[in-house]
A protein has these predicted regions:
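Conserved N-terminal beta1-alpha1 strand-loop-helix module at the mouth
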Residues: 1-83, 87-91, 111
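Conserved anion-binding
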Residues: 53, 69, 83, 89-149
Length: 149
């Protein structure tokens, strides 16, 4: 279960200059990176679902963050479908990020009161995400769309 409400996560996101996006298959390495970020003032961290057993590493990170970095929101990134979102929410993700907008993922997150930040590459995608209740989207892919988007 998420430690922070959707509103708390969105407020944290407004107050941070950067959100680290990271994956490593070794839980100990991941913990060391999270700790270094936390000690550097980071309070929002996205661990991406990009490798084998990423969910197991995430489960270990959740326990670590809850005991060692108590005011850090830990989210799961690279989430593209509902079952994976549900798995990370079950593990305790404070927010879900995706490279695309998936209405089913949005509904799953909203039912549980968890922020969903989908990647959007067009104005239509942004509008669709807003209509279903996404308060924040990420411009994706950023290197293609650029800050002018």
């Amino acid at each position: 279960m998420s430690t922070f409400s959707k509103t708390e996560v969105l407020l944290k996101l407004q107050n941070v200059p950067v959100v680290p996006v990271f994956f490593h298959a070794d839980a100990q390495v991941a913990k060391e990176v999270v700790r270094a970020c936390y000690e550097g003032g980071i309070r929002v961290f996205e661990f991406t679902n990009r490798g084998d057993r990423a969910d197991e590493v995430f489960a270990s990170l959740i326990s670590f963050v809850r005991s060692e970095c108590k005011d850090m929101a830990l989210g799961a990134g690279s989430i593209v479908e509902e079952a994976t979102a549900a798995r990370y929410l079950q593990l305790g993700a404070d927010f879900i990020v995706g490279p695309l907008f998936n209405e089913r993922v949005a509904r799953t997150c909203h039912r549980r009161g968890v922020a969903y930040v989908p990647g959007c590459g067009t104005i239509t995608e942004v509008g669709n995400a807003q209509e279903i209740g996404c308060d924040l989207v990420k411009v994706f892919p950023g290197e293609v769309l650029t800050p002018r988007f």
